[in-house]
């Protein structure tokens, strides 16, 4: 039962990724124009970094997808919404369930890709924790304005997923740079 639920949710997530591809492409194009423009203004040599650009696009796609899945994109914001929201500071009120596993899985790619995008982020493991915690706290905060649940255990699981992805990325980066 739990496996079929997780499988269904993963396919739903993949479908969201596919549907948000054009939006992510537009955002990526804007980021590239700004990035190349800054390099041009600074009179730097404009480098074509295909792998870095691919990672940037995928990271934008992941961020947009997470914002859609969590209800930030498409949510109805309102002034009275924070009063209607439920904020839980109880840890694992419902136990360690499929939603907990999915939270971790959702944030693994979010933590994995920045290792290949941002210089020197991989040097300290706590960068992965900060990356996940800040983004997750931001999501939970905004969710209070759209009448959704905000839960402390979501922040913890999202941060754990980000850290797992970050550490996998660091390991892969270390393996690939040793071989060169």
Residue ranges, per PLM feature:
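Bulky hydrophobic segments
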Residues: 1-152, 166-180
């Amino acid at each position: 039962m739990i496996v079929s639920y997780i499988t269904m949710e993963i396919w739903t997530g993949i479908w969201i990724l596919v549907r948000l591809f054009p939006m992510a492409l537009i955002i990526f194009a804007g980021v590239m124009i700004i990035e190349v423009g800054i390099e041009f203004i600074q009179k730097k040599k404009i480098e074509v970094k295909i792998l870095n650009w691919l990672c940037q696009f995928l990271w934008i796609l992941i961020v947009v997808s997470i914002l859609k899945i969590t209800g930030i994109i498409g949510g109805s914001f309102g002034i009275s919404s924070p009063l209607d929201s439920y904020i839980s500071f109880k840890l694992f009120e419902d136990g360690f369930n499929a939603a907990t596993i999915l939270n971790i899985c959702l944030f693994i790619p979010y933590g994995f890709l920045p290792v290949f995008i941002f210089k020197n982020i991989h040097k300290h493991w706590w960068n992965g924790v900060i990356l996940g915690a800040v983004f997750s706290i931001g999501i939970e905060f905004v969710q209070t304005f759209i009448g959704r649940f905000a839960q402390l255990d979501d922040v913890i699981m999202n941060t754990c997923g980000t850290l797992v992805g970050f550490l996998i990325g660091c390991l892969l980066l270390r393996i690939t740079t040793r071989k060169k």
